Amino acid sequence: MAEQGGLPPFLLGAIRFTVAGLILMGWCVFKKEKIFIKKDIISAAVTGVLLLFIANGIVIWSEQTLPSAMVAILVSSAPIWFVLLDKPNWPVNLKNRATIFGLIIGFAGVLLLFSEQIGGLFAASGGPSKLPWMLLLILGTISWSAGSLYSKHNPSSVSASVSTAWQMIAAGVIYIPVSILRGELNHLNISSVHTGSWMALLYLILFGSIAAFSAYVWLLQVRPATQVSTYAYVNPVIAVILGVVFAGESISFWQLTGLFTILGSVLLINLAKYRKEQRLALVNS
């Protein structure tokens, strides 16, 4: 159920993705883009379900039980799953030492970032009783990686904006019956929802979905999947920095070490890809 004054989690997902998808689709119609191509709609719907419903839904569900640090650590394993599941690119990725070392170093950086919290995670969260939730969260991370790779290897004939809109609409529609089955509407009092909750929803629609997720889908089309996957390492860094800047939180030595380790790993992964592109450019010139 929702926290006092907030929207229930799955209803929030339904509103967020449905509204964001319809707004983005409206923009595509305004630009007179092709939107009703059956093959692309099906492909986008599959991607949307894997990314925004299964993966994102599992994160929403898990956060009701697991500590946020544990969720962040498990979600940050996504780049590793990208490499393991991207079979067409195994010959390239598994032979690229910079990419492999970068992924390992990046995950180590995330562990350093949360090192001061890791020790008490199991004790604070009930230990082995949370194992099913942890496994479920790993499944969600695998779903995100699989959905991203499905999108990458099944290119659409429509624009990234149209594809993103269909993905969000598909996920938003599926969230609705889940919210109803969980009884979220039975306990909802719209008048008791705080203004801050509505503002948070507006932020998620405009920036979290229309801006950020659209950028993610576009990047999958134009950049290697291993590069795009490093967002999972960068997100915790941004969260810590925002906490320091806007919430007045302090940053420890180990957190600072983790930040630089993560940034170094992302640089290593991207530098390897950049050098490869430069070599290819020289050969073709």
Model feature map: region roles:
Residues A14-I15, L52, N56, V71-S77, ...:
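Helix-helix packing/entry segments at the starts of transmembrane helices
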